[in-house]
Amino acid sequence: MISVDSSVVVDLLGNDERADAAEDALRRALALGPVVVCDIVVSEVGAGLGYGSNFVDTLEEAGIRYSPTELRSAIRAGEMQRRYKQRLTTDGRNPSARRSVPDFLIGAHALLQCNGLITRDEGFFRDYFKGLRVVVPRTAH
């Protein structure tokens, strides 16, 4: 089972090079097994694009299932965000910078409940979720 990040779901809903790359990555993942989104991705995409209940139909048509975040994943996400903030402070950067809880929840869900994550944010997920298989949709240039 592989999870899909919010950025890739948004790409799937588009009509450009990124959409084509996301569709290709999704097709390859579906050939290997179930593909899921967690509750965080559903809420992020729903809030950002306002799809509401139509979003569920869109996911089902694409072959993407729903997988809620388990308690152990939520705990790991909190631990990873704490480490992230400590690292920023140690490096002299603002600890409230950039990464919010949803990023860590998505990563922890993929690491502990799935076998990988399809995302455009390769660097962050490889850095903070060691051992997580990261699949990056590639556009044809």
Annotate the PLM regions:
Residues 1-37, 46-64, 129:
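Short, well-structured N-terminal submotif of metal-dependent ribonuclease cores
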Residues 4-5, 37-38, 98-100, 121, ...:
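Histidine- and aromatic-rich ligand-binding microenvironments
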Residues 9-10, 42-45, 74, 125:
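A generic structural signal for short hydrophobic patches within well-formed alpha-helices
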Residues 13, 42, 92-94:
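Short, contiguous strand/loop micro-motifs
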Residues 40-43, 47, 105:
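Aromatic- and histidine-enriched alpha-helix N-cap/loop-to-helix transition segments
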Residues 65-116, 120-122:
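Active-site neighborhoods of divalent-metal-dependent phosphate/nucleic-acid chemistry enzymes
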